[in-house]
């Protein structure tokens, strides 16, 4: 199998296949990937600044882009959180970085996930966006297991311009996403 950048694959193979299957009249009606958002919620980050810094470095290695620290919008006494405390990290990938991350996710990361049987096809939100979670950052090739102090999961949201879930599912399947049957 020869390596073809995903952007080229989208232009040359996926667009024509989508036009044929869904009967689009115009090439611009074909759904495309808009962005990928990686979110990492860090519970104890509000009490320990080092935890935020460590996970920010890991997320920067994974995404190839510096993450933004997300802060609490409201105070919640049961969770011991005050308004403005850091509670997580997020990265929004677009363009070349998005396609590079997607390639790495499909070909390197998902095959390394323990007991992986395919992605849940129910992760669509009704508007053509797909969300799923990973339980540990160790499945990424940039993270070495020796240097990880605390295993941390993350949420990944793939935002498309698709109008329906069926269009988005077909788009992601053509990109090579392994959905459960």
UniProtKB/Swiss-Prot annotation:
UniProt name for this protein: Large ribosomal subunit protein uL5
Superkingdom classification of source? Bacteria
According to its UniProt entry, one GO biological process term is: translation
Q: Which InterPro entries match?
A: Ribosomal_uL5 (IPR002132), Ribosomal_uL5_bac-type (IPR020930), Ribosomal_uL5_C (IPR031309), Ribosomal_uL5_CS (IPR020929), Ribosomal_uL5_dom_sf (IPR022803), Ribosomal_uL5_N (IPR031310)
- HAMAP family the UniProt entry points to: Ribosomal_uL5_B
Q: Does the keyword Transmembrane apply?
A: no
Could you list this entry's UniProt keywords, alphabetically sorted.
Answer: Ribonucleoprotein, Ribosomal protein, RNA-binding, rRNA-binding, tRNA-binding
Phylogenetic classification of the source organism: Bacteria, Thermotogati, Thermotogota, Thermotogae, Thermotogales
Entries under Pfam families matching the protein? Ribosomal_L5, Ribosomal_L5_C
């Amino acid at each position: 199998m020869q390596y073809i950048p995903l952007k080229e694959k989208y232009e040359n193979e996926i667009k024509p296949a989508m036009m044929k299957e869904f009967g689009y009249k115009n090439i611009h009606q074909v759904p495309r990937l808009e962005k990928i958002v990686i979110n990492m919620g860090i519970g104890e980050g509000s009490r320990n600044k080092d935890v935020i810094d460590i996970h920010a470095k890991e997320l920067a290695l994974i995404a190839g882009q510096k993450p933004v620290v997300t802060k609490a919008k409201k105070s919640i006494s049961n969770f011991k959180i005050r308004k403005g405390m850091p509670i997580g990290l997020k990265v929004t990938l677009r363009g070349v970085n998005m396609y590079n991350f997607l390639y790495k996710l499909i070909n390197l990361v998902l095959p390394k996930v323990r007991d992986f049987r395919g992605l849940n096809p129910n992760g669509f939100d009704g508007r053509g966006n797909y969300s799923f979670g990973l339980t540990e950052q160790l499945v990424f090739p940039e993270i070495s297991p020796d240097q990880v102090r605390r295993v941390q999961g993350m949420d990944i949201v793939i935002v498309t311009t698709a109008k329906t879930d069926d269009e988005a599912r077909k788009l992601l399947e053509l990109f090579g996403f392994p959905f459960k049957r």
